[in-house]
């Protein structure tokens, strides 16, 4: 029902549907630290087509028992942690434009909510340097998801919203809405398929955009479980 409500709330005017591929490879260093390498077609926040690659380091607390039970079938064990801290770097290759260097800092809270739903609230700052010019943006992503079983298989549909404050426009300039589903495959692989609608108001006229995304998530650990 939530997915239907989100989709019917989207503007009816159709735009060209674009494709966003992504690969994230995660490695648990121990029970507290995790690193991951990300490569993606990054058009977050209304950016033009650009390729982003870089690494992040995450620090998180011990898992909450209730969250751990909710996320039993999700390979991403960071979702069972109440607090996740992240720092990272991305190199952005932009066609016909100077490259960009981005520092990332993020704080994510995970909470169990009613009826088996899991909520996450990610607060992230992107600090960007391009051709000697510094800009920043703040983005706040709120996600609700729930695991469903089809016989012995478990899948994880979700909805999310993420507004962006951009320093170059001095205002909240973009809102992204998502509806998607995560499909675990075995012990190390998840696929995230989603639909994304962006409303970009930084420039005139407003630029609504639509995307279909496919992300491959890989999970490995140095610790034996």
Identify the function of each model-found stretch:
Residues 31-37, 62-68, 82-85, 114-119, ...:
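Repeated loop/turn-to-beta-strand initiation elements of outer-membrane beta-barrel proteins
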Residues 17-19, 49-53, 99-103, 134-140, ...:
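Residues that define the transmembrane beta-barrel architecture of outer-membrane proteins
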Residues 15-82:
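Start-of-domain marker
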Residues 27, 59-61, 76-78, 109-111, ...:
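Residue-level signature of outer-membrane beta-barrel architecture
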Residues 39-45, 89-95, 111, 125-129, ...:
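Transmembrane beta-strands of outer-membrane beta-barrel pores
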Residues 23, 53-55, 105-107, 140-144, ...:
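Membrane-embedded beta-strands of outer-membrane beta-barrel proteins
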Residues 110, 118-163:
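Detector for outer-membrane/organellar transmembrane beta-barrel domains
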Residues 58-64, 107, 208-225:
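Outer-membrane beta-barrel "beta-signal"
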């Amino acid at each position: 029902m939530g997915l239907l409500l989100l989709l019917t709330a989207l503007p009816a005017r159709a735009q060209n549907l674009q494709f966003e591929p992504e690969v994230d490879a995660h490695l648990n260093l121990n029970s507290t630290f995790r690193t991951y390498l990300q490569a993606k077609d990054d058009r977050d926040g209304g950016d033009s087509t650009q390729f982003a690659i870089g690494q992040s380091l995450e620090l998180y607390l011990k898992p909450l028992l209730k969250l751990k039970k909710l996320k039993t079938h999700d390979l991403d064990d960071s979702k069972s942690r109440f607090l996740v801290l992240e720092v990272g770097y991305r190199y952005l290759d932009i066609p016909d434009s100077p490259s960009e260097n981005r520092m990332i800092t993020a704080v994510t809270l995970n909470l169990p909510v009613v009826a088996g739903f899991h909520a996450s609230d990610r607060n992230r700052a992107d600090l960007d340097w391009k051709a000697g010019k510094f800009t920043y943006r703040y983005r706040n992503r709120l996600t609700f998801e729930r695991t469903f079983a089809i016989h012995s298989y478990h899948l994880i549909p979700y909805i999310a919203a993420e507004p962006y404050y951009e320093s170059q426009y001095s205002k909240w300039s973009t809102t992204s809405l998502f509806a998607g589903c995560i499909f675990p495959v075995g012990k190390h692989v998840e696929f995230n398929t989603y639909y994304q609608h962006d409303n970009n108001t930084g420039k005139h006229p407003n630029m609504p955009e639509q995307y279909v995304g496919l992300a491959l998530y890989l999970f490995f650990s140095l610790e034996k479980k």
